[in-house]
Amino acid sequence: MSETITYQYTSPSLLDKTKDQEELFLSRFSEVQKNEAPCFFWGRLTDPYITGRCLVTLSNVVQSSFNLSPFQLALLKDPIVTAGNEKIRFEGFSHCCSVYARVDVLPGGYDGEFPASGTTNVDFNQPMISALSGIGRNEQVMLSVGKKEVALQKQGSGKIVERKVPLPVKWIKGLTTVQLYMAASEKVFTFNRMQALQLFQSIPAGKPKADYHLVMRGNKPSFSPVSTIDSICVGGVHRLKLMEPLLPLATQLKVFPHPDMQSTTWQLYFGNTCFSLSLSRDCWRGFSGEGAALESLIEDVPDQWIDAVDKYSYANQVFNPALLSLEEGIQLERVDNITARLAAMGLLGYDADENHFFYRRLPFKLSRILSLNPRLKDAEKLLEEGKVNILSRSADKVEAVVAGTDVVHTVMLEGEKERCTCMWFSRNQGERGACKHILAVKKKLIS
């Protein structure tokens, strides 16, 4: 499978500078967008200096990598922008997909209107980053997001034209996975600015391979190579340095660990702007390679339900499962499965601070997203070839065998515990999602 999806912008992105203002126009692309709305947002940023610094930091994340070659690093990738429901969100991944970043401009962070809502892709090359870096504290800056234009208005001159860029396949996979990890995470720590600065000063130099742990010593947080009972495990702790330039500007830092420590989310607050950074468990294991979404993709969801979500939802809208159940006549007990399924398909993002999903339609066909899970495809192939046999089944235990290559694997499901005799399960112990044999057995049980 190709590692990138190449697409054609209808027009280039550019920064148009005149004597009295600057206008930033960002192009967009979508395989699925129904309405060609010319503008998603137009208005004035109330704190453009903070917004500009957050977007520059997000760009640094997008241009970073913690396990790729110099050749791969030369390929710039583009953030995704969602505007609607009185919020503007910019999000992106590092090249290796082990770091996910998002900038949320919330109500009060702008003075403007949302003529329509939607999701678009924009390219942040160096000229654009330089323009964002040049925003001063007292400047009046106008912003618009749409099909043909996003405008930053300030003093200056000249024009910057951006090129189209390919969007990596693993970005799409990462977007579907990171939301499920964030949804399972809960806030554990809230630090003020001084505590946040103290914490980041304890990040070891270099690129430590060993795990570090966020521990509290009295009122002072720090990173330690030794874990304690209530500590938070962070692999690849040096990745947090990406958000270090924002610390002196932030008022608060909140930490949201995954219950199994498979990810951590770090959120900085600047009044009406929020910057989020999520780290995968290890540098070499990005969100795109995780199996968190696989369980949600086992059970098929009728196309009419997906169409129903698309019908009443709009960009950044809070996803209300109860409303979906009521309006479409779906049994309430199935709504949780539908929510997880929609998140796994990229239709939902997650706001850890407000503890809810929000609708965000990725600009790609659902069939493409669903085709990006090789383990699930392998499980379906095992079923098609008749290689799955259920030996016994009771209320709390299932035993099955799955024919492999020159070997037969045994699968045991006992309550929430599941085991398989294959090498994948032996190596990962379920930390990276179920193996194809367990997926095949589960899919057969519900078919």
Which residues are covered by each model-predicted region?
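Long, low-complexity, compositionally biased intrinsically disordered regions
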Residues: 1-447
